[in-house]
């Protein structure tokens, strides 16, 4: 049965176009304006919501966080019906790649970004990925984050069973808990785990 897709998240990586050019040398992704306008194209195409993310640490994280928030804010004003979400990934060690040196974003800086998003756009959802350790994620969902992943694989093609030539993991996972373990942790923090955020009637 065909399921309609209705949500798009785009990882802009950095809003510094000069830095962006050094990271993407070929393919469609290298065209900065095309990438930048992806969320608006998705909303025009009928998506109910869009997500935004800069990879914090590729460039000045405060500038990228500000640009991410402002980008989302402008689209929220233009498309008030749209659901808006932020992801807050920090640059982590990359397997088989020692050429990208992160501009370190430590836990206090990550907390600053997450709280800034929450204050700036109080109705947006905020995701904290398994790049972060169990302690950080458990604390952030008690402060400002609304979504966390669990039981994740970051290998390219790793969710497809019939692909033989699968890629390496894209980054190291810091929180390896299963879905059941994360579910229980949320209950232990007096939070209500919700496995889906909408129901079609």
Question: Where does each model-flagged region fall?
Answer:
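Short hydrophobic alpha-helical runs that function as membrane-insertion/retention elements
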Residues: 9, 50-51, 147-151
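Conserved non-cysteine loop/helix-boundary elements of the Radical SAM core domain that shape
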Residues: 3-47, 55-77, 98-107
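Auxiliary Fe-S-binding modules of radical SAM enzymes
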Residues: 66, 77-201
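Proline- and acidic/polar-enriched loop/turn elements at helix boundaries
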Residues: 12, 54-55, 152, 198
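Short beta-strands and strand-loop turn motifs
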Residues: 49-55, 86-90
């Amino acid at each position: 049965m065909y399921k309609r897709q209705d949500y798009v998240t785009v990882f802009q990586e950095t809003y510094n176009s000069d830095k962006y050019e050094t990271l993407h040398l070929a393919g469609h992704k290298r065209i900065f304006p095309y990438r930048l306008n992806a969320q608006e194209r998705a909303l025009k195409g009928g998506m109910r919501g869009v997500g935004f993310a800069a990879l914090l640490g590729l460039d000045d994280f405060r500038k990228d966080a500000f640009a991410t928030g402002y980008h989302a804010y402008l689209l929220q004003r233009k498309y008030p019906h749209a659901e808006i979400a932020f992801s807050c990934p920090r640059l982590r060690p990359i397997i088989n790649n020692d050429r990208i040196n992160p501009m370190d974003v430590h836990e206090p800086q990550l907390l600053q970004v997450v709280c800034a998003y929450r204050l700036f756009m109080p109705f947006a959802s905020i995701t904290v990925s398994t790049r972060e350790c169990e302690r950080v994620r458990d604390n952030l969902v008690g402060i400002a984050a609304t979504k966390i992943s669990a039981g994740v694989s970051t290998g390219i093609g790793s969710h497809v069973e019939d692909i033989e030539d699968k890629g390496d993991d894209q980054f190291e996972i810091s929180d390896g808990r299963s879905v059941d373990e994360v579910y229980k942790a949320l209950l232990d923090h007096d939070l209500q785990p919700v496995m889906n955020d909408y129901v079609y009637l």
